[in-house]
């Protein structure tokens, strides 16, 4: 049976590859966490080490295992040969779970975010804090039954959207309340379109 640690809270991170409203093709909900290189990740690293020792004792060194924390400067775009911009000078990790997690919004009094709003509320580029735990795993060869790979992964327990941020890969995010603030409830026209003048270059 896999060893699993007690959960901890992460430092604030930038969200990437958020999959929280519905599971992926493997049936998992997940989020990739981009931590600044200077973030205090000692509690997270200690949790991973505790998981290693809890499962295998001193039998394996961390370098012999697949571990969740990765160097962002090694996340290379195969087409350009450059580091993906959002990964530069970061440490990143992915946390996942088979179960839908509760997501709170710190920008709105830590109220739960409805599932229908998760895709727009927790987007790539916003900032979050996660409650995560670590668990051990081993992959065995189907024919021989021998272990061919072992490691530690992170389980997503709960999530807090901490703050908005610059969206990654999707352009600027506009606030709906601001966009429609001047529209009356019974308005037929947005108010900024005047009577059309015929004869312009833009006639259709």
Place the predicted regions along the sequence by residue:
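OB-fold ssDNA-binding interfaces and closely related basic DNA-contact patches used
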Residues: 1-94
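Glycine-aromatic-enriched beta-strand/loop faces of beta-sandwich-type recognition domains
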Residues: 88-120
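Generic beta-strand structural signal
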Residues: 89-91, 124-130, 150-157
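Generic short beta-strand segments
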Residues: 98-100, 133-136
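Exposed beta-sheet edge/beta-hairpin loop segments within beta-rich domains
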Residues: 107-128, 135-150
